[in-house]
Structures are given as C-alpha cells and as structure tokens.
Amino acid sequence: ADSLDWREKGVVNSIKDQAQXGS
C-alpha cells in the first residue's frame, strides 16, 4: 500500500496542480 501511496498522492497533486493552473 505504501508503494501506491506516493503514486496516489502524486496523481492527486498533478491533477490539483493542473486544475489550479488551468483555472
């Protein structure tokens, strides 16, 4: 689960970053 933890956080961070930058 730890291996996916950084992946999930990275994906969420990327989406949040794009959403803020896109908006």
Swiss-Prot record:
Basic and acidic residues composition-biased segments: 1-10
Q: What is its EC number?
A: 3.4.22.-
The GO terms describing molecular function are: cysteine-type peptidase activity
Q: A GO BP term, please?
A: proteolysis
For this protein, the record's SUPFAM superfamilies field holds: Cysteine proteinases (SSF54001)
Does the record's keyword annotation contain Flavoprotein? no
Enumerate the UniProt keywords alphabetically: Hydrolase, Protease, Thiol protease
Disordered, as annotated region? 1-23
Instruction: Say which family it is in.
Output: Belongs to the peptidase C1 family.
Protein name (Swiss-Prot/TrEMBL): Cysteine proteinase
| Taxonomic placement | Eukaryota, Metamonada, Parabasalia, Tritrichomonadida, Tritrichomonadidae
